[in-house]
Every structure is written in C-alpha cells, then in structure tokens.
C-alpha cells in the first residue's frame, strides 16, 4: 500500500546526518500519540484548516513549511498532536526537525509535497510502519523525489514564500492548484459572503456583487482573475448585465464612456456642475441609482446637463430683462410717473369708479416691483410733511367731508405712491435742473385742473405749487 511507505520517509527525512537513536525514540513517541488522535484530527481538520496551525505555539518557527501542505487537504497527525494537549509533542516535533535545517530549505517542503499529493493517512496505521530498513527508506525517497519534480512548478511558487514566514496571512492568495478545487477551509467562502452583504447594502455595487458571486462558482481554480474584475466592477458600476469575461466587460465600458464625456463637453462652458458628473461616475462614485442604470448611464447625464443649461439660460434672461427694464425706467421715468399721477388725480377728481383705481395700482406695482429693496427703506424714512404736501399738490384732501363719494387712500396705496415719487426724485429731478423745470411745467396743468375741480382758490394753488417745489428740492 502506498500510504504505508511514507510514514518512515517522512519521519526520518530530516535526520540523515543526526543520530538514528534519538529519532527512533521520538518517532515511536509520536506514532503512539498519533494513533489515538488520528481519526479525530482528520475529521476535524478537514473543515477547519487554520485552527491548529495558528494555535500550535512553539512549533510555528520550525514547522511552518512542514505543516503547510497538510493544512490544505487534511491535517491528520499534525493538527491532533500539535494542539499542545500532550507534553511530549512539542519536543517530538521540534527536535525531529530542529537539529537539522533541511526542513526549512528544501527537505520539509518536498516531503510535505509527497504527503500533499499522495494523501498520507498514516495516523490510522500505528507503529507497524516503522519496521523498515534504511535502504527501503532511501529507495522510497528517490521515488518521491521523482514525483515531486512533476508538481514542483505548480506548487512551489505558493508554498516556498510561505515556508519562510512564521504566520499565514497570504494563504488564500496562493496560485491555484488541485487543492482549491475542493477548498477545505471555511474562510474563503465567508470572504465572498462578506462581499455579497456589502453589495446588498450599497446599491451602486449590486452588479459587482452578482459578478463576483457568479465568478466564484465557475472559476474556483482561478481566484486571482475573479477578484480583479470584481474590484474593478465596484469602482466603475455599469448597468449592462455583467459578462463572465473581464475583457468583454472592459469593451462595454469603453462603449459607454465616450457618450457621457461628450455630453459633459457640450455643456462644459455653460454649466460647470455637469463636467464633474461623468468624471465622478467613471471614478466610482455611485451617482445614479439602480432605477436609472438599466437603460444606460449616458442619458441621465445628458438630461440633467440640458436641464441645468436651460435653467442657467433662463436666469440670465431674467437678469438681462431686469437690467433692460431698469434702463427703460431711468429713461422713461417721467412719462410713467406722470401716468401714475394722472391716474391718482383722476381717481380723486370725481369719477370714483374702481377701474381707474385698479389701473393706478397696477401701474405703480409694475414699476415698483423692479426697484431694489434698498430704496424702499429710504422711502419709508422720509418725513410725513413732504408726503402730505405732495398729496395736497396732487389734489388729495385730508378731510374729504365735502365729497361723500370720495374714498380715502389706504396705507398700501400711499406707500406705492411714495415709492414712485422717491424714485423720480433720485433718478432725474434732483440731479438735473432742466428735468426739474420741465417736470414742473408739465405737471402744473394737471395740478391746476385737479385743484379747480376740488373748488380751491388761486392763492391756494400758488401756495401748493411753491410748497411742491420745496418738496422736490
């Protein structure tokens, strides 16, 4: 039986230069221990490979290269004995390999390789396999070395770097061999489960999780190639259904990318926000929710950029319209204000219908809305005497007992009227003397008609005109 041959070869391999007596005693001691522990070690270590390896204490320094291959498939003797439950186990393992350095260089890894590929369930057989002569042992060693050369290229890149290390952090990163077709450890599947949980919480990485889960099933022998597209997918979420090959996926990405960048270049000068959107999407920021993503990523960007450009154009148009209205008001303030004053006078004359009142309010409101709010505060700070003088000059009576149909002005109407007068004063009349005289000459006939209809004397009109001039100044 092939399993019987490797027990003496494995036990005596590391001690060809040392005394045979010490190894014989340690071999017997170890075999007695392993016979009781063998089956329990196999059944336990088949599912949990890293438990005994991390807990074996002082065996870690010399025995990593020797323990390592058996950790991947089945740890029959090493796990059961190296748990530290027996006092003599540490001495047996340490001395059988410790007084000779060959296990660290090539001896330990090569013998472990034999056990790794031939499945040495030697712990069930007991001490009966020790009765072998050294010649048989050396012949078996030669056969094992021939077998070792067949698998050296595959296994040694992953086994030799780990042999020199004291811990086992990069064991899952090893290049694929026959061991990974049926992984015994529960750590690699749990790693993939963690990725799935994260992807469920994060909607941007949902497609990447589906890709990694599918890749882990059909590419168990190629862990490195499946992890690279999954990370790449996490960085750049794409709506297309994830293909199994990363090359096709990259081609998909190049198809989608130019459209989004072109849409950003179109609106780059009008809207700086849309420039950052496709760049952020290519960099991995999940800007689009899964609802938008099934169609493609470029249309939402184009839609949003066009919306933003439309909004910015509208706002600029409003601003330009506002500036135009301001210029028109400064040029035609006299005519507009005179129209407003005419409507006020007509309302107070005798035709007290609600229509001219509404028209007057509308005219004042249209002109007053375009004014800045700073002037409003300045208007409210003026004295009441000047306002009353203006109203009297317009023909307004403080105590309208004479005319029963005359409606008193409300506070809102007064405020609007003061706004218009203050604007006129600031724009043209106070600055330019020509405009002032012209306005007085133009507005005087309206005042005279209003006052005549209100049954006022000529002296009162002259006094009102002088007071009005003082108020304008």
UniProtKB/Swiss-Prot annotation:
> Which segment of the chain is annotated as a signal peptide?
none
Instruction: Give yes or no: UniProt keyword Cell cycle.
Output: no
What are the annotated disulfide bridges? none
Pfam families attached to this UniProt entry:
Vasculin (PF15337)
Q: Does this UniProt record's set of keywords contain Transcription?
A: yes
Protein localization: Nucleus
- InterPro entries per UniProt: Vasculin_fam
Segments crossing the lipid bilayer: none
GO BP term, example? DNA-templated transcription
User: Which keywords appear in this protein's UniProt record, sorted alphabetically?
Assistant: DNA-binding, Nucleus, Phosphoprotein, Transcription, Transcription regulation
Q: Which domain of life is it from?
A: Eukaryota
Which residue stretches belong to region Disordered?
14-55, 88-127, 155-189, 235-267, 281-316, 453-473
Q: Low complexity bias located where? A: 292-309
Q: Which residues carry this modification: Phosphoserine?
A: 49, 76, 199, 289, 381
What segments bear the compositional bias annotation Polar residues?
Answer: 14-25, 103-112
Please list the GO terms describing molecular function. DNA binding; RNA binding
Bias (Basic and acidic residues) ranges: 26-38
Post-translational modification Phosphothreonine, affected residues: 298
Give the family, as the similarity comment puts it. Belongs to the vasculin family.
Q: What does this protein do?
A: Possible transcription factor.
Family matches, as PANTHER family: VASCULIN (PTHR14339), VASCULIN-LIKE PROTEIN 1 (PTHR14339:SF10)
Identify this protein by name: Vasculin-like protein 1
């Amino acid at each position: 039986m092939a399993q019987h041959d490797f027990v003496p070869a494995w036990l005596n391999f590391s001690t060809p230069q040392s005394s045979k007596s010490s190894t014989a005693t340690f071999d017997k001691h170890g075999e007695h221990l392993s016979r009781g522990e063998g089956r329990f070690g196999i059944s336990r270590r088949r599912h949990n490979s890293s438990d005994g390896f991390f807990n074996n204490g002082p065996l870690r320094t010399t025995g990593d290269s020797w323990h390592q291959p058996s950790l991947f498939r089945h740890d029959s003797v090493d796990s059961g004995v190296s748990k530290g439950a027996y006092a003599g186990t540490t001495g047996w393992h340490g001395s059988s390999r410790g007084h000779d350095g060959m296990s660290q260089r090539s001896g330990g890894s090569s013998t472990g390789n034999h056990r790794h590929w031939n499945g040495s369930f030697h712990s069930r057989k007991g001490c009966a396999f020790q009765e072998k002569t050294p010649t048989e042992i050396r012949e078996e060693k030669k056969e094992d070395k021939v077998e070792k050369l067949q698998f050296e290229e595959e296994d040694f890149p992953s086994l030799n770097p780990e042999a020199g290390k004291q811990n086992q952090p990069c064991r899952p990163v090893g290049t694929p061999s026959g061991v990974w077709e049926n992984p015994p450890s529960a750590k690699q599947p749990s790693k993939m489960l963690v990725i799935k949980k994260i992807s469920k919480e994060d909607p941007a990485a949902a497609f990447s999780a589906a890709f990694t889960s599918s890749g882990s099933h059909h590419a168990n022998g190629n862990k490195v190639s499946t992890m690279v597209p999954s990370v790449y997918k996490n960085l750049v979420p794409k709506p297309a259904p994830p293909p199994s090959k990363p090359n096709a996926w990259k081609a998909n990405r190049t198809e989608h990318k130019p459209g989004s960048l072109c849409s950003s270049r179109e609106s780059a000068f009008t809207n700086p926000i849309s420039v950052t959107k496709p760049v952020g999407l290519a960099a991995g920021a999940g800007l689009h929710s899964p609802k938008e993503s099934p169609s493609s990523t470029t249309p939402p960007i184009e839609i949003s950029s066009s919306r933003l450009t439309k909004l910015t154009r509208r706002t600029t148009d409003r601003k330009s319209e506002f500036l135009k209205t301001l210029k028109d008001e400064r040029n035609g303030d006299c005519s507009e204000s005179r129209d407003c004053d005419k409507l006020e006078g007509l309302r107070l004359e005798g035709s007290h219908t609600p229509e001219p009142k509404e028209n007057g309010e509308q005219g004042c409101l249209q002109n007053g809305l375009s004014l800045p709010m700073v002037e409003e505060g300045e208007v409210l700070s003026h004295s009441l005497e000047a306002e009353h003088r203006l109203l009297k000059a317009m023909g307004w009576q403080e105590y309208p007992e004479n005319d029963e149909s005359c409606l008193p002005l409300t506070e809102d109407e007064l405020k609007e009227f003061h706004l218009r007068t203050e604007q006129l004063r600031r724009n043209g009349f106070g600055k330019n003397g020509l405009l002032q005289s012209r306005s007085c000459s133009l507005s005087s006939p309206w005042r005279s008609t209003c006052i005549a209809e209100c049954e006022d004397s000529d002296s009162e009109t002259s006094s009102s005109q002088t007071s009005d001039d003082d108020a304008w100044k």
